[in-house]
Design a protein with these regions (language model features):
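Core segments of cupin and vicinal oxygen chelate
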Residues: 8, 16-58
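Short beta->alpha connector loops
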Residues: 42, 65-66, 87, 110-112
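Vicinal oxygen chelate
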Residues: 1-7, 10-19, 37-39, 49-54, 70-136
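Acetyl-CoA-dependent GNAT
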Residues: 63-68, 131-134
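Short beta-strand/turn micro-motifs at beta-sheet edges
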Residues: 1-3, 66-70
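Short, charged/polar, Gly/Pro-enriched secondary-structure boundary elements
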Residues: 55-60, 123-127
């Protein structure tokens, strides 16, 4: 058997469609402080935006296909979870979203409500800001 690829050094792109690139960009850029890392328009019928933080090991890509409806998140448990162990940093992140009119929603899994707040993006996908650390 071949040795598996060493994915621990890979850069992760989380990509999904959206029906409203402007609204989803505002949510992640203005609400969560992401930067626009790249954009494209009408590339083989697709337009998109990549959002993230320069130097980070991940970024998000949102695409819109001309003539196709992406629809809303398939469940209330489709999550991106950001662990923010520093209480002041967590409070700033929550306040930033709330200051833009985004209200927390009750998490589908009550675990996330114990130390975090859950927000829905414009497509119904959820983002958890968890006031805890993550240790593997």
């Amino acid at each position: 058997m071949d040795k598996p690829a060493n994915l621990d050094k890979a850069h992760l792109r989380v990509a999904r469609p959206s029906d409203d690139l402007l609204a989803v960009t505002r949510f992640y850029r203005d609400g969560l402080g992401f930067e626009i890392l790249g954009e494209f328009e009408d590339h083989d019928g697709f337009s998109g935006v990549m959002l993230g933080h320069k130097g980070s090991a991940y970024h998000l890509e949102f695409t819109r296909q001309r003539g196709h409806e992406a629809g809303r998140a398939p469940t209330e448990d489709n999550l991106l979870v950001f662990y923010l162990p520093d209480a002041a940093e967590w409070n700033r992140a929550v306040a930033r979203l709330e200051g833009l009119g985004h209200k927390p929603v009750k998490a589908f899994n009550p675990y996330w409500d114990k130390k975090g707040k859950t927000f829905e993006d414009p497509d119904g996908y959820r983002v958890v800001l968890q006031n805890a650390s993550w240790a593997v």
